[in-house]
Structures are given as structure tokens and as C-alpha cells.
Amino acid sequence: MFKVGFGFDVHRFSEDRKLILGGVEIPFEKGLLGHSDADVLIHAIIDAILGAMGENDIGRLFPDTDMKYKDISSIVLLKEVSKLLKNKGMSIINIDTTIVAQKPKISPYTDEMKTNIAKALNIEKTQVNIKGKTTEGLGFEGREEGVSAYAIVLLHE
């Protein structure tokens, strides 16, 4: 059986944080505000995987009220979700994602992001796709207030 999951996440920019996307620290004057490292791409992927498995969302699995997740790398959380996936006897066919940000440009970092995600999930890099988009100056991303990410995953059970 095949199962599809969809994920979305958004975080606002913050002056005193690093910008982490797909487990890659991207040089930029602002980072994203959040309880963990606020990696919107990984969070969207986690929610997509959890959705396809019929599990709770990222906020219930890794609540921001639990201090053990404070500033944690989202790659660590993704590895935990990978274990759940394996325990359920499911495997990833492919992941397709979109990062929406006016700035910074994402394309120079997507290859390293794919590598990080594939390694965390124990899949091939060719099973992960990442696209960067702007909103042509529209919306909160266009006003450079934050970043959003969308992910869809196809699982096989």
C-alpha cells in the first residue's frame, strides 16, 4: 500500500538566531525563531511523514513545552521519525519540498540539504527534492518577515 503525507511549517525571522534550513547553516543576518533550531524545511518533512503514517503532528510528538527539545537540531528529530517509520514497516519512496523565502537564495545550499535529509532518513539523495521559491514580494515571506516550507512524501507499507 502507498500512503501520501503533506507537511507545512512557518517561522518568523529573529535577529539573534542562526538560519538553519535542511540541517545547513546558511549565512544570513537573521535566523528563524522557534523552540528547536526552527528548521522549517525539516519540520515540514516531519509533518508530511507523520501524516502519511497516520501519526500525530510534530508539535505533539516533540512539544515545545518539553525543555529537552530546546534548541535541538531538527535533524535529530528527523532521525527519531525515521525510527518510527522503520518500526511501522514503512519506507520512503520520495520527498518533494518547497522553501518559500524572499531572501536568502536557497539554490546554493539545496544539494547539502538533500544530503543531510537523505542521511537522516537512511534513503538515497535522489529520493529527496528541494526547490526554493520567492513570493515576488508578496505576503510575509515577500516582506522578509520569515520563511515557510511545504513537503509531500510518498511512503510504501
Swiss-Prot record:
It comes from the Bacteria. It is an enzyme of class 4 (lyase). InterPro entries: MECDP_synthase (IPR003526), MECDP_synthase_CS (IPR020555), MECDP_synthase_sf (IPR036571). 4-CDP-2-C-methyl-D-erythritol 2-phosphate binds at residues 9-11, 35-36, 57-59, 62-66, 140, 143. The record marks 35, 134 as: Transition state stabilizer. Involved in the biosynthesis of isopentenyl diphosphate (IPP) and dimethylallyl diphosphate (DMAPP), two major building blocks of isoprenoid compounds. Catalyzes the conversion of 4-diphosphocytidyl-2-C-methyl-D-erythritol 2-phosphate (CDP-ME2P) to 2-C-methyl-D-erythritol 2,4-cyclodiphosphate (ME-CPP) with a corresponding release of cytidine 5-monophosphate (CMP). The keyword Lyase applies. It comes from Caldicellulosiruptor saccharolyticus (strain ATCC 43494 / DSM 8903 / Tp8T 6331). Pathway: Isoprenoid biosynthesis; isopentenyl diphosphate biosynthesis via DXP pathway; isopentenyl diphosphate from 1-deoxy-D-xylulose 5-phosphate: step 4/6. Its cofactor is a divalent metal cation. This is 2-C-methyl-D-erythritol 2,4-cyclodiphosphate synthase. The keyword Disulfide bond does not apply. Keywords: Isoprene biosynthesis, Lyase, Metal-binding. Binds 1 divalent metal cation per subunit. A divalent metal cation binds at residues 9, 11, 43.
